[in-house]
């Protein structure tokens, strides 16, 4: 709820992720926020963050960082550890923060992208409310030939 209230009207929002979180990062920015909510975004991999993007981040820039539990976790942790030095408008969503009752620790890395997908879906419910824009409405998709 808080995330949606804070970000529903962002002029631009940056999503950062790596490893098995890259799918959630990319698709959430492009398919959900751009296509379905009509909000401007950019998705970037954690390993590319320090090759340009961090130069455009300011104190107010909206940035969401996804952290998974696979071998690429250190890349996203590096971004998460750095971002507070330059930005006050960031969110870190770490799959480790969500309990997976009955799932062994050694398997979490294989499931963490599903956790992120569930988190994104919960955010979407609140984004629809805040934007007053049902996500099934499109301007062009399946409305015009292209």
Predicted regions and their residues:
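A SIS-like phosphosugar-recognition module
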Residues: 1-146
